[in-house]
Each structure stands twice: as C-alpha cells, then as structure tokens.
Amino acid sequence: MAQSTGSKKVKTAIFISATGSNLKSLIKFSKHKKSPIIINLIISNNSKAKGLRYSKIYKIKKKIFDFKNSLSEKKVINELKNNDIHLICLAGFMKILSKSFINNFKGKILNIHPSLLPKYKGLNTHERAIKNKDKYSGCTVHFVNSRLDSGKIINQKKVRIKKLDTPKNLAKRILIQEHKLYPAAIIKALSL
C-alpha cells in the first residue's frame, strides 16, 4: 500500500453512485492536518448522483464513466493514472469492478460495506441481519479483490440491533459508524 511520507499526502480518488455521505466524511477527513490523504478526484457511474455536488463545493475534479465495458474501464484507468492516484476508496459505489481493473490497482482499492463481513455480502444487508435475528450488525472496510465483498478486512465496527429496529433506522445508525470507521481504516491500510 502506498504510504504518506511526511507532509506528502497520498493522492486519492473516491468512487460514488448516489448521495455521497461517506464522500463528504472523507473530504472532511482529508482536510485535517494529520490526514494521510488528499482527494484529487471523484468518479461516479451516475451523472445524477447527489454526491457529485461535493466536487463543486470542495473544488475537486469530477468525472463520470458508465463502467459498461472494458473500453470504459480503460478510460477510467487512464484518468486515474493521469492524476497520479495511489488510493481508490469506494464509497457507496454500486458497480462491480472487473478483475482487470482491480489488478491495475492491486492493494490500492478499499471498500466500505454495511455489514460485519463475511456475513451478508452484497445488497439488503440490514434486512437480512434483522430477519435472521442477529444481535449485531455493523460495517466493514476491506481491500477489494475479484470476489464480491471478500477482500482482506481492515477494520470493522459493531452496531447493536435493537428490538424494534427497521432496516432504515439500523442503516442510519450504521452510517454514523461508517463515517468514523473509514478514516481509521485508511490510516491503518496505509501503514500496512
């Protein structure tokens, strides 16, 4: 993993598909003096993603790609390399990256997932945790590999499931923890 050296921060791209609440949290984290990252690029597969507004607010370059085929992915790879990106953080990015893409940035792609992996990979994590009467759910930051939500776990945070929880209110409580966990996981990942 690329390490930040002294005052030199790791150039980072954030991939989003929707609201960008983790993006906003990571931007705030990157502005801290002791943060090891600088966010140089926001990439989305959705031109209507609400999170793209942070590009204007924080003056960060944004690019939209459809990720529909290998040609599109090559354009993304070129954009990342042209911007000297050394860390990619997936933050609510709802596309599965190809093995070829992942191999281009092996060990440099992180993802945040709203469950305690390896439980509940994929979608509808909160519904499944409640349906199965789990006592805890939570969130996980992991390295991305070619298998869905299966990369090496960096950090996790447990959140107790309350008796009257709905998927929506459990998701809100987990999201609060995601905003704390992702920055800590980035620091840990960069030190590995």
Describe the residue ranges of each PLM region:
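One-carbon transfer enzymes
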Residues: M1-L192
